[in-house]
Structure formats: structure tokens, C-alpha cells
Amino acid sequence: MSRLKQGLKTRQTRFALALKVALLGGVVAFSSVAHAEVILKEGITPASDASQIPASAKLRTDTVVAGISEPQGIFNPYFFVNGWDENVTNVIFSRLIDWDSQGKLVPGLAESWTVSPDNKVYTIKLRPGLTFSDGSPLTAEDVAFTLTVLLDPSYDGDTDITLANIAGGADYKAGKADSVSGLKVIDPLTLQVTTTQPGATTLAKIGGPVLSKAWYGKGYQRGNLDYLRSLHGKPLGNGPYVYDKYIPGQEIRFHANSHFYRGTPPTPRFIYRVTNPSTNFQLFQTGETDYDAFTSRPDDIEQLKMLGFANINLYGSSDYSQVEFNVHRPALQDKRVRQDRKSVV
């Protein structure tokens, strides 16, 4: 379960919301409100004077507002191109198989699963009574449809489902088959996935968010995902919140999903407010946002502490960077040139 969705599902973990908002190392700050003691155990420096909370934040009892950099509006978990769009999809969609705080795979939409002795066949059982946010049923057909989309030759997102080695997946992608032989719907709650070889990451690969076949798959034909792409700004999911509206440059609005399989979130409304380094402190200071991320410069940290009401979490970056050489360029075909540039980097 992502920290963002966990924070939205239960009031006692509401502070965890901000930890998902920032994708880079730095400082996350949030207003001090009820049940802080639960989250402070996770290492967050508590507010020094909670009485200093801005009046506007105190009055906002039914809405959580989190700062976010401006997304591109691609609100589909398999097509987003930046982390800010991903943050949006994280509150709209739920995973089939989730992770706990220790990185262990745990049930999500799937109630349970079994693996054959040869580690090639996965039988996944869905929780009974699952629905999408519009109340339509979520079944094994939707899971099979989702995996089929990821194997479509026109799919150009970042999820590489080929690493799961689903039987028949390569043939479907190459146009040699009309369906994926390794995907078998046993009944509305059961999907069997057959692979060609064991894989340590197979469950994680096939256990992602589930798309509604009825919503995203209207008229679906292999090799054409145009209709699905046309719905990037009209997402239908099964997560804790339902997408309402995106006002470019301003905010993304959501309301609690009454059909959420873990129960309706206690906070009725959620807003992602678009902020940037030149506006985020002022918006937080005046109570217009409850959570946001800041750089970890000493002056910034001190400024946040002086507010009194800010709970602060200083954390390191989990990002990485890499440099690759285009060896098709003649100048870089010389190993010595590459070594020289590497030493400079």
C-alpha cells in the first residue's frame, strides 16, 4: 500500500500523506492536527506550538490539501510520464497485489493467491463484492483486460509486463495470436496466469492497478489503444478517492470513494494544490495547504521550525541518476574517450 493512500484511508495515519507527495530528498512539513502522536512515532519532529495553526487550516475540517508540482494530466497508472501524475493515480486506483511498509507483497484487490509447485502458474482470487468507483463490478475479466493492454503492441507506457513471461504474451504482441493464452478467467473472482518460466518479480509485475474493461475497453481491438488514451483525463478507478476535476496550474480535486473496498475514507474531500518553490512556504504558512515538500537547506528548515505548528520530516533521496554513452557516435566508440569522460563525471 502506498504511503499516500494509507494516509488517506485512516485518520490516524493521515500525516503519512506527505511522505508520498515529495519525490525528491528534502523536508516534508504538515500542520499539526489530531492524532499526531501516532505518526510522530515514525520519526517526525513534532510541532513546538500547535496553537499557532492558521485559522484557515483549523476551519477546514472535511478536506486535506497537499502541495504538488503541476502534473501533465495523464491520469492512468500505466501511461503517466512523471511522478506528479503518478501521485494523482495513486489515490484513484488500487493495486491487485500491494506492498506493506517493509516491501513485502500483501493482498490488495486480490484476497489471496497460490503458486504451482514449478512456480509457473499463479491462481489469483479476488475479494468478493469489489466494484469500481461508479459501482460497476470489478472481476477477473478486468484483471485479464488490464494485462492484455500491457501486452498490446501499441502500448507505449513504462510498465514492462514482458518481464513476467506470461505464456502467449509474445505471440499476442507480435500479432501471431488473437488472445493471450496464459490468461485464463476461471470464474468472476478467479484468474489463472501461466508463465513460461519462474520469476521472482512476477507477482509484483502482474499485481498492478486494475482498469475497468467496461470503461477503458469499449471497442478494444489489438493494436489500437486510442480510445483508452482518450480517457486519460477521465479516470475511473477503485482507490480511496474519486477524481472530480483538474484545473491546470491550480489544483486536482477528489471526493471519498464510498465503494472503496477498505471502507469510505474518513476525510470527505482531498485536493492536490499546485505549488512550486516560490509559493509553497507562503501557502503552508497561511494554512492553504496541509502538507508540502521543501528543500533541505538549513535556512528552510529553520524557517519551518519558527512557524511553531509544522511537523517536519527530514529524509534522504531515494533517486538515482545515470549517464549513458551513445556509442553510435564515432567519437564515443573509442573506449579511452568514454573512460576519460567517466572520470570527469
Per-region residue spans from a language model:
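Alpha-helical secondary-structure segments
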Residues: 65, 139-148, 188-194, 239-240, ...
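Aromatic- and charge-enriched surface segment that lines or borders ligand/interaction sites
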Residues: 111-159, 192, 283, 331-333
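Ligand-binding "clamshell"
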Residues: 301-314
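Gly/Pro-rich hinge or "lid" segments in bacterial periplasmic/extracellular proteins
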Residues: 197-265, 269, 279
